[in-house]
Amino acid sequence: MKKTGKNHQTNRNRVRLTPDSAVPQEAAPSDWSQIKHFNPREFTCKCDGLCDHTDCISPEFVAKLDMIREQIGLPITIVSGTRCERHNRKVGGKERSAHVPWTGASHAADIRCADSMFRFAFLTAALPLFGRIGIGKDFIHVDDDADLPQCVIWVY
């Protein structure tokens, strides 16, 4: 390790991190039959029925949230799951948002975050599972959209 300043160190040979590296892949179901804590309605587009995006969330994505829910033992409230393009624009989402089911399934959710203890527990469990995490004041965004840059964390 090379010291770079007061209490800071860097590793010249950085390790390439990949999401899912610590997750047994056989745990991810391809349908909703093994999902304990969520149902598809929680991830439906919130555009008041103007679109037909009612069952477009990836079950493999939801399985990761289910594993987190089981691990932290706390309820997880979905603020936003799948979005149609129209609703995504209305809420100020990115043009190429993982919330929109571009390839048939969406791969993103915004999770209500009531306090810092929940934030800590959720992030600790989510880091090995998701390569894309956004942190807002009262929500956490997670997605596993393989078409977007990986191993990134941002703040809103």
What are these regions (language model features)?
Residues K3, C47, V91, L129-G134:
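Intrinsically disordered, low-complexity segments enriched in small/polar residues
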